């Protein structure tokens, strides 16, 4: 269970490799968590080298997945209960993410800037995240 604005690691390795696929499911009392960005910290970086513009954007969706489920060879939304839960996938076959000396992939439960929470009140609620990450390591 992630608290509001908590950054949660969904994959963490000290090895080198290649990120290939990410699946994520989330369940909450509102969709404000979708304002949170997916971040990739490569090596020993303190700041992310990859930053999505929101959770649904990372999975190639928009506007809180307002168009419903979709399936493409690269990304898709396989389950949706509006304003409550979703599951989605993203393949990085065409845009692989290589990493050396470690990769920490995170999701943040909501987002803020200059003291303001994106999406307005009430902000993100506690959110249950489940993930599966497929990476090749060497």
Map each language-model feature to its residues:
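Beta-strand-centric surfaces of beta-sandwich/beta-rich domains
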Residues: 1-138
